[in-house]
């Protein structure tokens, strides 16, 4: 079940090791041009019993790409996330608007990108439509609306780290 990391750790009788997270990031950072670290659950989601995802982001020092679900409440959620990031001194590279269900074709989801452009100073890097069956065996023929559109092809990822 999708739960916060400390909850999952308790369910498995494990402890999240903060230092291991940083060592792992440093290791992988040496092996690749770009390292994306998912901020599971959002910036204020608990990461350990005493720290949040925002603390991890601050410690790593990587710029944030804020991924936003495209639905009613997106504008509020985005502005709150940006406010938290800025107050904690986190660098924001931009936003990705992501549709996670076929219901994402609501009036709110259609107007969210333009409304956000008016309210935030960060670029919208991509808007991703709902991708039915996107988690499939890569050898199977894709089906469904918007499947395997490549909204990230035009992003120069290396410039986001500047």
PLM segments and residue spans:
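C-terminal lobe/tail of nucleotide-utilizing enzymes
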Residues: 83-162
